[in-house]
Amino acid sequence: MKIEKCPFCGNININLMMPNASGRMVPETRQLNMSRYHLIVTTEDIFDTRYITMITNRSLVKTSISAEAYEKYASLSPEAIAEMIKFPAIICQESKEYYGKTDEEQQAIYGLIRKITKINKNVHIYFHPLCYIPQLKLYENAVDFGIDVSCAISDLNHTAWTIRDVNLLEACQDTGIQILVPST
């Protein structure tokens, strides 16, 4: 994997091998916009599948994302989706305890969004995992990641797809979480 930092635009270009529709690995260059990230919390098995199905009333809800992000992305227009797939993602299963707390065993996925499609009242979010991160670290450093764990049913306990106005690379660096992007 070759990674370049774009000092003028705040984006990161990643060259990696991705499977195409037939499963064959082909080179792909992805430009990541690190100014925001997807936080996807689900009850689905995130380790055996490469997509999440989210009902629309839990997708980019006005009360769970910034007003600017809601205005830009909630429509799921082709232009919005083209911009959203440039954000990295944290995909995780609902935490095991109240307030977003979990044990050391529960893992989240740091990855890339490959495709977003809306079908009736569902949104399919296809992703490519890059590495695992301990979900307990997200809980312990929730403020750094823009995650609210102040109530019993927190952001990590509630199935939802949100976009956080947090630079995921900086948050991971600040909290000592190793991901597959070099230090800047």
Language-model features: where?
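N-terminal helix initiation/capping motif
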Residues: 19-66
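Low-complexity, compositionally biased segments
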Residues: 14-18, 23, 48-51, 158, ...
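Long, low-complexity intrinsically disordered regions enriched in small/polar
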Residues: 1-28
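Flexible, charged surface loops at secondary-structure boundaries
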Residues: 1, 32-33, 82-84
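Structured alpha/beta reader/binder surfaces that contact nucleic acids or chromatin modification marks
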Residues: 57-142
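Generic structural hydrophobic/aromatic packing signal, biased to beta-strands
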Residues: 3, 14-16, 39-41, 89, ...
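Contiguous surface segments at macromolecular interaction interfaces
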Residues: 2-5, 10, 122-184
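Generic intrinsically disordered, low-complexity segments enriched for polar/acidic and small residues
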Residues: 5, 34, 44, 48, ...
